[in-house]
C-alpha cells in the first residue's frame, strides 16, 4: 500500500519513468510496495498477456468473431486496476481493456462467456465480443462508438460529487478518441464541475491505421489538459510502477475533491488493431521489433529478479496456475450453453407490451 502521495510533475516533455530498461529503480523516493504486491502486479500482467493469447486462439478456431489485441498494454491496464478501489470506484473502459477487466476481478467465465456469447455472459450475448461489463464491479459496459463513454463518465463523476460518495470515475480510451467531439465535451464538463474523474489515454500511437503524428498537432495528449485547466501527466505506460503511482496520485487527488486529471500512458500494441486489420500495411516490422525490446513484462521481470522476487521456477508455477484458470474459465463458459433466441425479448421493457409478447409467441412457434 502506498504510504504517502508522491507528487509528480505535470506537462513534462519526457514520460515519467520509474523502472529503467534493465529493471533498475529510477524513482527519487523509496519504493513503498511490499514484495507480494509487486509479485501480484507481475502475475496480473502475465495473466493479461495469456488471456490476450487465448483470445487469438478463439478467433482463429472460429469460436468468436472479433478481438482487439492488447499485448503491450498490460502494465498500463494492470496499474489502473491496482490504483483504484475495485467495486467502489467506477471504470468506464474501452474495447481493448480486457487486461484491466481481468485484473479488477471480472471472472474468466464471464469474460470468455462474453466472447463466446453463451449464458455465462452477463450481457446475455447482446454485445459484440470484447465488450464486457460488470454490475458488481462498477465496470461500465464497453461501447463501440469511439469516445461515446466519456460524457457518461463525466456525468457519473458529477453525481458522485453531488452525492458525496467518495467514489472516483476512471475513464480509459485510445489515442484516436482524443479527436472526437464527445471526448472534448465530456472532459470539459467534468473539469468545469470539478468532478472526481481521471481520464486515461492508453496511447499506442495508432488509431487503427492513423499514426499519432497525423492524429493531432499537439506534442502529447497530456498537453491537451491545458485547454481544460486540469493537470496533465505524461507517463511511460510500459512501466507498471510509474503507471501505478501516477494514476493513484490522480485518483486520490480526485477523491480529495481537487477535480479531474488527464493521464497519458504511452504504450504500444504489438498486434493489429483488431482481427479485421492488417497492420503490416501501415507500420514497418522494424518499428514493431523496436518496441518489442521494451516489452513491459520482461522489463518488470528484471526489476523483480534484481530484488530476489522472481525466479524461473516461480514463473512456471504462475504460468501453470494461469493456464489452469483459463482452461477452467473457458470450460465453464462453453458448458453454460448458447444464449437462447427468446432472450432477445428480455430486458426490453419493464413489462412486456402486447406486441412484444406476440412476437415472442411467434418465435416460439417457429422454434
UniProtKB/Swiss-Prot annotation:
GO terms for molecular function: 3-methyl-2-oxobutanoate dehydrogenase (2-methylpropanoyl-transferring) activity; metal ion binding. Its EC number is 1.2.4.4. Mg(2+) binds at residues 175, 204, 206. It comes from the Bacteria. Its cofactor is thiamine diphosphate. PANTHER family: 2-OXOISOVALERATE DEHYDROGENASE SUBUNIT ALPHA, MITOCHONDRIAL (PTHR43380:SF1). Belongs to the BCKDHA family. This is 2-oxoisovalerate dehydrogenase subunit alpha.
Amino acid at each position: 500500500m502506498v504510504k504517502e502521495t508522491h507528487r509528480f510533475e505535470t506537462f513534462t516533455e519526457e514520460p515519467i519513468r520509474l523502472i529503467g530498461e534493465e529493471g533498475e529503480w529510477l524513482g527519487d523516493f523509496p519504493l513503498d510496495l511490499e514484495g507480494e504486491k509487486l509479485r501480484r502486479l507481475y502475475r496480473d500482467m502475465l495473466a493479461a498477456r495469456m488471456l490476450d493469447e487465448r483470445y487469438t486462439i478463439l478467433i482463429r478456431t472460429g469460436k468468436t468473431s472479433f478481438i482487439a489485441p492488447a499485448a503491450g498494454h498490460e502494465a498500463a491496464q494492470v496499474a489502473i486496476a491496482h490504483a483504484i478501489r475495485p467495486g467502489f470506484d467506477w471504470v468506464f473502459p474501452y474495447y481493448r481493456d480486457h487486461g484491466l477487466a481481468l485484473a479488477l476481478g471480472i471472472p474468466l467465465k464471464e469474460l470468455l462467456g462474453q466472447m463466446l456469447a453463451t449464458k455465462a455472459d452477463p450481457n446475455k450475448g447482446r454485445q459484440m465480443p470484447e465488450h464486457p461489463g460488470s454490475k458488481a464491479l462498477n465496470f461500465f459496459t464497453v461501447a463501440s462508438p469511439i469516445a461515446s463513454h466519456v460524457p457518461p463518465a463525466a456525468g457519473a463523476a458529477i453525481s458522485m460529487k453531488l452525492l458525496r460518495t467518495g467514489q472516483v470515475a476512471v475513464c480509459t480510451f485510445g489515442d484516436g478518441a482524443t479527436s472526437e467531439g464527445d471526448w472534448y465535451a465530456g472532459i470539459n464538463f467534468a473539469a468545469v464541475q470539478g468532478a472526481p474523474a481521471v481520464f486515461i489515454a492508453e496511447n499506442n500511437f495508432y488509431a487503427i491505421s492513423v499514426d499519432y503524428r497525423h492524429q493531432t498537432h499537439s506534442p502529447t495528449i497530456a498537453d491537451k489538459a491545458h485547454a481544460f485547466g486540469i493537470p496533465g501527466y505524461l507517463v511511460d505506460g510500459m512501466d507498471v510502477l510509474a503507471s501505478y503511482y501516477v494514476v493513484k496520485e490522480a485518483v486520490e487527488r480526485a477523491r480529495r475533491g481537487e477535480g479531474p486529471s488527464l493521464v497519458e500512458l504511452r504504450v504500444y500494441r504489438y498486434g493489429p488493431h483488431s482481427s479485421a486489420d492488417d497492420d503490416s500495411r501501415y507500420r514497418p516490422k522494424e518499428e514493431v521489433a523496436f518496441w518489442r525490446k521494451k516489452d513491459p513484462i520482461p522489463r518488470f521481470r528484471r526489476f523483480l529478479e534484481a530484488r530476489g522476487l522472481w525466479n524461473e521456477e516461480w514463473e512456471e508455477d504462475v504460468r501453470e496456475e494461469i493456464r489452469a484458470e483459463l482452461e477452467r474459465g473457458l470450460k465453464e463458459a462453453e458448458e453454460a450453453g448458447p444464449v437462447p433466441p427468446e432472450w432477445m425479448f428480455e430486458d426490453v421493457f419493464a413489462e412486456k407490451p402486447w406486441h412484444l409478447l406476440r412476437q415472442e409467441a411467434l418465435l416460439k412457434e417457429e422454434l
